[in-house]
Amino acid sequence: MANEQNEQSQDLSSEQTTQDHEQTQTEGVEQGAEISVEDLKAQIGKLEESLKLEKARTANAVYEAEKVKERAEREADTAKKFALEKFAKSLLDSVDNLERAIQAAGKEKTPLLEGVELTLKSLTTTLEKFDVVSVDTTNGFNAELHQAVGIDPNAKSGEIGNVLQKGYTLSGRLLRPAMVTVGQ
């Protein structure tokens, strides 16, 4: 019987130990749960900050990419405009020759003269489509657009007397200055 009581005592002691152990585990889990929640909240805060930082970096990268794209488009437009410069300069000689042919023909309208005039008109229209336009010589002498090659005694001071050769610009940039005579 003492043996039975001893076994019952051990069983009770074992049950008590098991209950204490379970209670300790439950408290540990609860404390662990509290710590885990706090840790998770801290991690969430860190992740939110990291997300904000990455969003800002992404927005900055998108902004920079747009700026690079815009600059490349501008440079391509500029290159396209001025890539025609050498070609346009070559065509100006043809325009000059056609104008000289028209002047040399006189006032008599012949089919040949009409053909030359139509060719000149077609060529100048094509040049204007690509923003190649003649320099204005009606508003007086401008050293940036005109080259004075002589003096015209009949013209007023600062005025253009005769235009010896037309000047041209390409998209506002001077291709060739107008060769003119000016008054004293």
From Swiss-Prot:
Please give the function described in this protein's UniProt entry.
Participates actively in the response to hyperosmotic and heat shock by preventing the aggregation of stress-denatured proteins, in association with DnaK and GrpE. It is the nucleotide exchange factor for DnaK and may function as a thermosensor. Unfolded proteins bind initially to DnaJ; upon interaction with the DnaJ-bound protein, DnaK hydrolyzes its bound ATP, resulting in the formation of a stable complex. GrpE releases ADP from DnaK; ATP binding to DnaK triggers the release of the substrate protein, thus completing the reaction cycle.
What are the UniProt keywords, alphabetically? Chaperone, Cytoplasm, Stress response
Which GO terms of type biological process are on file?
protein folding
User: What is the annotated localization of this protein?
Assistant: Cytoplasm
Q: How does it assemble?
A: Homodimer.
Q: Per its record, what are the GO molecular function terms?
A: adenyl-nucleotide exchange factor activity; protein homodimerization activity; protein-folding chaperone binding; unfolded protein binding
Chief localisation class: cytoplasm
The record's listing under InterPro entries reads: GrpE, GrpE_coiled_coil, GrpE_head
State the family named in the UniProt similarity comment for this chain.
Belongs to the GrpE family.
A family per Pfam: GrpE
Q: State the source organism's domain of life.
A: Bacteria
Query: How is this protein named in the record?
Result: Protein GrpE
| Ranges of Polar residues composition bias in the record | 1-14
Q: Where is this region: Disordered?
A: 1-35
Q: Record's Gene Ontology CC terms? A: cytosol
| Chaperone is among the record's keywords | yes
| UniProt source species | Acinetobacter baylyi (strain ATCC 33305 / BD413 / ADP1)
Q: Where is the signal peptide?
A: none
Q: Does the keyword Chaperone apply?
A: yes
